[in-house]
Design a protein with these regions (language model features):
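Sequence-structural signature of mature extracellular/luminal beta-sheet repeat domains
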Residues: 23-337
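N-terminal export signals
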Residues: 7-24
Length: 337
């Protein structure tokens, strides 16, 4: 989540539950800008972007729950997690989604942010308000805090996650949940960190040098970790080559310089398809990149697109876009077979 986007948040409103929506007056219809013919096998030429939910305060962190066939997504400032399915439309799934009872003068995003699934079908929550990574058993709704401190100091406002094949959880911890950011009296950690968590082991700091680590994703072979930096003064996407221990073998390397990109938003969430195609939130919308960083196209919605995930049969891309959620059919597999 990016603080400079707050001017784009709509006022709190009830979410309209319906499978699709016409664009509200003044809203821009989502479009696909094609920059290369290579995009056609990724997003078919006749593909259309649907609006499946709207009137959200700030849509974030989508994840598809295979066992149940539904989408979950966060609304961090509203402290709500919502559910969507083609059959039932939109409903409230969890409230509070993060931590209740926090002082709004100190915490501006008390709810969940990034969501993921572990390899046992349990929901993982980047708890922005609680400064923790939580796990929820979807059958019992039992919630467990997995990690909330590094080196004895509380984490800030956990933002996004990527789960490795080994089960390790990589996550980012910027100060976006705090009303005063780095200057917050609640902030204990010196760094805005990228971390690696393995249950039963000490939390590992992957990198503490990024000013605003945000979106995070692993390559299909788990050999590279990608992280977006959302600082308006240093907008970029970097990557780390990972060793057999799951930690970087060297410093971060630049993958995408986003400082020259135009349009709403900053570098944010991302997902990587089974063939290595990258869907990366950056200024302008959701960019589609090759594994080498070539720009193939851009999904635009007239507002920042915070994050995305694959869902349904693995060939649907869901996008959380400011006050609404979008759906787009793909021509490639998001998940490995």
């Amino acid at each position: 989540m990016i603080l400079t986007r707050r001017t784009l948040l709509a006022s709190t409103a009830a979410l309209i539950a319906a499978p699709a929506f016409a664009d509200a007056p003044g809203e821009v219809a989502p479009t696909i800008r094609r920059l290369s013919p290579k995009l056609d096998h990724i997003i078919p030429p006749n593909a259309k972007v649907e609006v499946i939910a709207q009137n959200i305060k700030w849509a974030e962190g989508p994840v598809w729950v295979k066992d149940g066939g539904f989408l979950l997504f966060s609304d961090p400032p509203a402290n709500i997690m919502r559910r969507w399915s083609a059959k039932d439309g939109v409903s409230i799934f969890m409230t509070p989604s993060g931590t209740a009872g926090l002082d709004p003068k100190l915490v501006r995003e008390a709810g969940s942010n990034g969501l993921a699934m572990d390899h046992h079908g349990r929901l993982l929550i980047a708890n922005s308000g609680g400064g923790s990574i939580d796990r929820v058993d979807l059958k019992t709704r039992q919630r467990t805090t997995l990690v909330s401190k590094y080196d004895g100091k509380r984490l800030s406002s956990c933002n996004d996650m990527a789960v490795a094949k080994s089960g390790a959880i990589y996550f980012t911890d910027p100060p976006y949940g705090f009303a005063q950011g780095d200057a917050s009296p609640l902030k204990e950690a010196k760094q805005n960190g990228v971390y690696r968590f393995v249950e039963g082991q000490p939390l590992q700091l992957v990198d503490g040098s990024l000013t605003r680590p945000n979106g995070i994703a692993l390559s299909p072979d788990d050999k590279r970790l990608f992280v977006s930096n959302s600082d308006e003064k240093d907008r970029k996407l970097v990557y780390y080559d990972l060793g057999s221990d799951g930690m970087p073998t060297g410093p971060a390397k630049l993958f995408l310089d986003a400082s020259t990109l135009k349009g709403p938003g900053n570098p944010d969430g991302m997902k990587i398809a089974a063939d290595g195609t990258m869907f990366c939130s950056s200024p302008g919308g959701m960019w589609i990149l090759t594994p080498a960083g070539e720009k193939l196209g851009l999904i635009e919605d007239g507002a920042p697109i915070a994050n995305c995930c694959f869902g349904e049969d693995g060939r649907t891309l869901f996008l959380t876009s400011n006050t609404r959620v979008l759906r787009l059919r793909l021509g490639i597999d998001g998940w490995a077979a």
